Amino acid sequence: MKTKLFLIACVAVMMTACSQKQSAVSVPVSQINVETLLDSIDYDMDVSGLQLSDVRLLRNAPAAQKGFPFKDAYIRGVYGTTTWYDSLVWKFAEKANFENIKMKDDEPWRDYYYRASKEIGLINFTEQEQAFIDRLQAREDELKKANFEAGEGLRVNMQNLVNPTQLKEFDSLLCEHLAKDGFAIVPAQHDQLFHIYEQNDYNQFPNFVTTDLFLQLYHLYVDCLLREVEEQKLLQLMIDFSKDMYHAMNRWENWSGEDEVLRQTAFHNAVFFDVAYQLFTGQYIGSEEQNAAAKPEVEKVMKSEDNFSEFMQDYHDVKFGYSLFRPRGHYTRSEALKRYFRGMMWLQSIPFGTRHMDEVREAVLIACAAKYEDQAMKNYDQLNRLITLLMGQPDNLSLLQVIDEVKKSNLQLNDLINDEKELTRIKEALDEIGNKQTRIRPAFEKTSHNKICILPQRYQPDAEVLQTMVDNDNKPTKRDVPKGLDFFAAMGVASAEQILKAEKNEWKGFDNALEQMKERMTQIDWQETTCTQWMQTLKVLTDKEGKQQMPYFMVTPEWDKKDLNAVLASWAELKHDAILYAKQPAGAECGGGSDVPEPVVKGYVEPNSGFWKKAIELLDNTEKVLKQENMLTERLSEITQRIREEAQFLLAISDKELAGKEITDEEYDQIKVIGATFENISLDLVRGKDQYLMGWSDVQGADKKVALVADVYTANSDNNPNKSILFEAVGNADEIYVVVEIDGCLYLTRGAVLSYREFTQPLGEQRLTDEEWQQQLEKNARKGVPEWMKPLFVPLNKLPEANEEYFYSSGC
């Protein structure tokens, strides 16, 4: 078996060499045959022509002859391909009698094993062997000085890789990209980022832990905490609120007597809450007459196609956006969430337009009644506070603002409803507030300038940028759809602005609009909500705190684009999670144990300490909001702590890497198993109540894949002949290969990155769900990849394969 493995290994090396023939750069091809090193080592050999990886192997040959179980996973893996090494390791283990060697306090078993082995003389060398080892160590130290002595236009010396056979076949195109940029992204179709790290663990492939991995986990955390809170608490709050407010309106209808104005107003409002209750529960609550009036609205909501409305005065002759009622995001995951989505969308988006006195009157009646509905308003306030802290302030006028204005009136409700002068005062006061407050407005308004909503959707600064960065002046428009890059350029991310300005743009107003938005973004309180803190965390990722200490590959324009890909993908996840609450802009209306220690696989964490600090702060603030609103369950609290510990660990490693401090073997072990760690946390997040998931293969539905989609802008301006919907999305996970320097040696590492996507589809088509997006990716895996990212990709005919003949783990 060992002979067969050795022959396979030789073939792999020959294939690697063949793949390099046409390349100006290549990885080192071994000139030594480790199989022959058991009996014959030429201690006087000339080593001046050997590559660094061979020098390291030869330096360890005397120890291999003694069966020493190397701590270095790569060296142990290479010698493990011989017919003789493993049997010698077992003999070494049999001699390892440490009964008289006491373990020190807090000493890891691996450290104890190697210390004890040395103390009982298991790894002593002859003078000739030691001289050979010392000579090779000196040569190794000399070669390391050339780690970054590469040819013109290259950043790293690929000949100095110390783990060149980590891949079964090292594609020349991948090698060229690595030499040029220090990293390369290989398009892949992994369901989850942590799958790549788990495969690395199995293959003893050094991990490169990306910020993407944490960003994906944070998205899942927010997404799942919202689901839990919405299904277990908020849905019932809104069912009760709608029911109580319906009964209040029904009472006023019954009490109206001969006051026809009051009766019609109360009837309309009763229908409003009848619809809400039906959407939340699937059942009508009203009278036969009320249900008959509610049914057409419910049908339009369920059909989710833009249409006219007899119920809303603004939309008799203008189509209302019923398409927005289609459950998307995580709201497709259960029937309860679908009902919650539709019901909340009704309360958030059905307007009482201030240019229609009848609708002002309706809003005033709801406000008057709400003052006496203590439990209903407690439910309202509980949800409103939480959503405000998580998502932002209302953009349209809210029920609370109408209540404030009603309180200023000394009239009884019956008199107020019929007092045109007082209603006009309230209308004008609300208009004054709305003119200052509402920032997300269509450029081509055809309905009331100010709208009152019971629970308005929330202002988020990215929406203001998107609506501003389109051409509403020229006919036809010269920029009909904004880009995700617009938002980050407005936030001051230089690389985003550079990409935008390098693109062909016929709209002369672009620069002025961008400068306007850059100024506006300086006025935002980024600490105000969880969503704005998330956005600011993404900005910090691009800032690169301590840039002068960062590794060579992170201070390049190419890595800036890698960062942009990560922040845009995470932003797409944010929009996915906030799709119900954020107001959308529009143009117009395991293995066995062992007697010897497991080897150490050295890994690397993307050392962006500024990001890791901000990520911990973001997590802490999210937990604080949940605690403040009594929404933090014991399960969420435990998961939050686990995620925090991972972020704190990644920050600590980043700080060590930047400071050049030694990373312990135990820390490398933790990096090695980070894929399994993140999978376990993710499983805890997505599992249902009382559900047990053995592994990710047990996860069902859209949650199984990282791919998701969110519609963020409706391009339906009057001057736009090609009306469409803009989608921000994440595709399946890609692989990233990075050449990093650890303890003076260049290692090939592998990690996972998010895949940002952006695309449009015609306005008349249904807004996409995650399930439909994932189906589209099965037919067109690279749909929506932006042009500016394509130079970073290495489009290989097949994914690089880890060299399992050399490297595999016996652990879980």
Model-derived segments and their meaning:
Residues F70, V78-F148:
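Compact alpha-helical subdomains of small soluble proteins
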Residues M1-L5:
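Positively charged n-region of N-terminal signal peptides that target proteins for export
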